Regions:
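Cationic, glycine-rich low-complexity segments
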Residues: 56-182
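N-terminal secretory signal peptides that target proteins for export/translocation
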Residues: 1-26
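Domain-level recognition of nuclease-like catalytic cores that cleave nucleotide substrates
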Residues: 417-447
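Membrane-engaging insertion elements
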Residues: 168-189, 253-294
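Conserved catalytic cores of phosphodiester-cleaving nucleases, focusing on short active-site segments
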Residues: 342-407, 412-414
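Amphipathic interfacial helices
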Residues: 123-177, 184-246
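Acidic-basic catalytic patches of nuclease active cores, encompassing PD-(D/E)XK
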Residues: 280-367
Length: 447
């Protein structure tokens, strides 16, 4: 069994939180600060930040660049959306503005922009379904009485559910696991939707459209809910071909996928079953119950976040440090950091599987550090663009000068899913840190 250790306080071109309508400026600034906080840890007693500031003649200011300099031409605009003219970049993430037929959006990272483009195409496809004869017929069928039961369930769920035989619950959910989880995450459907199999239809449509069924995009959720209710209550049936044809743009923006097993599980199983499987997997890894509970009961983590993280840790079979990473991910306090932890886990699994086997995993300065058998320590970061700032340079100096070495280390590498500024490239080089840019092309993420 691994010994849990408390973590320290703490993309390819083109993810962190995106809601509709557009966030207020204060909300955006707050979320950005939380993302930065994941990477930043300074012990004032070391004087590290001050020393770094004195040793560096210049730092990068925030960047404002033309969107055409950052985003591939094919993604600048589509049938239902248009990117804003500029991209703002702070220390780690690119910030976008998007106008669309379904309202404005502000995706605060490359990966979230890719996700939004797929979601916009999915929304358009779902709206086509609303206009179809099949949807109109299903709506009529739903109005003949099936919906009344749903309305009763929504208005008085306790008394309605109490009349359902116990055997039904074994089909629609794991009551004991739901109790262990202490409720559902902010991304999941309610009791009514689950009991009426609406959630099952939502997962099916989300899979066909290549979108995350637990997405926080409110417009997408509204459209998915509408079509899924018609399917559950009105026997709406649609062939796979009709879904795929209208979603061709999604495939172009999707790219290669890793951890397909995790993705398939999320699309196939209800949240309670995912939680049960994840709990058992954590037990087999030797993760203490108290750590597993903290992780699975953190409702900022969606079932998708949790499942991808657990499947990634399973890939690192027998490696010391997995408990520390689960404990680290359990600290997610908003959707942005939840996604960041998921992507870190994906990068670790991808590196271990396709580059070099990892022998040990530690959390240092709130950043996962992987140690290989080739005397290499590697830091894998799902960030869009690294600017050389007082904070980022301080982290780099600490990694170069005081990184713990539980295994022999002769070489330190930093892999970024995005790229780095000229100053950041030079700064890392002076510290003898090898920089690998655009790692997302070699280690693609699920978005």
């Amino acid at each position: 069994m691994e010994t849990p250790s408390e973590p320290s306080a703490q993309h390819s071109k083109l993810e962190i939180s995106m809601h509709h309508p557009v966030r207020t400026r204060s909300r955006a600034v707050f979320s950005l600060a939380l993302v930065i906080a994941v990477f930043v840890f300074f012990n004032r007693s070391t004087g590290l930040a001050g020393d770094t500031a004195q040793s560096q003649a210049a730092f990068d200011p925030p960047e404002v660049r033309p969107s055409s300099d950052v985003v591939p031409p094919a993604l600048l605009h589509g049938p239902h959306y248009q990117l804003g003219p500029t991209v703002k970049t702070f220390t780690f993430m690119n910030q976008y503005s998007v106008t669309s037929d379904y309202g404005p959006f502000s995706p605060p990272s490359d990966a979230r922009l890719r996700r939004l483009i797929r979601e916009i195409a999915a929304i358009a496809e779902l709206k086509k379904i609303h206009e179809s004869d099949a949807f109109a017929k299903a709506t009529v069928e739903a109005g003949k009485g099936v919906v009344q039961g749903a309305q009763n369930l929504i208005k008085d769920p306790v008394s309605t559910i109490s009349a359902v035989p116990e055997a039904v619950f074994s089909v629609f959910g794991r009551v004991s696991e739901a109790a262990k989880r202490g409720g559902r995450s902010q991304y999941e459907d309610g009791v009514a939707q689950n009991l009426l199999a609406v959630s099952s239809f939502k997962r099916e449509y989300a899979q066909k459209l290549d979108v995350d069924v637990y997405s926080s995009n409110q417009v997408l959720q509204k459209e998915l809910n509408s079509v899924a209710w018609a399917a559950a209550a009105g026997n709406l049936t649609l062939g796979a071909a009709s879904m795929v044809t209208g979603a061709a743009v999604l495939q172009a923006a999707s790219g290669l996928r890793t951890l397909d097993q995790a993705k398939n599980l999320v699309n196939a199983l209800p949240a309670t079953e995912l939680a049960r499987r994840n709990r058992e997997a954590l037990r087999q890894m030797g993760v203490p119950n108290v750590v597993a509970d903290r992780f699975l009961q953190n409702h900022v983590l969606s079932p998708r976040h949790e499942t991808v993280i657990v499947e990634a840790m399973k890939t690192l079979r027998g490696i010391p440090g997995r408990t520390a990473f689960i404990q680290y991910a359990a600290r997610a306090d908003n959707e942005d950091t939840a996604l960041l932890f998921q992507e870190m886990a994906e990068l670790l699994a991808g590196y271990h599987r396709t580059v070099t086997p990892i022998r040990r995993l530690d959390i240092y300065l709130n950043i996962p550090v992987a140690y290989t058998g080739q005397e290499i320590a590697v830091v894998l970061l799902p960030i869009d663009r690294l600017l050389w700032t007082e904070r980022s340079s301080g982290i780099a100096v600490s990694l170069a000068q005081s990184l713990p070495k539980p295994l022999p280390v002769q070489h330190l590498e930093v892999w970024l899913t995005g790229d780095a500024s000229i100053r950041a490239q030079e700064g890392l080089k002076q510290l003898s840190i090898t920089l690998v840019e655009h790692a997302g092309e070699r280690l693609p993420l699920l978005d």
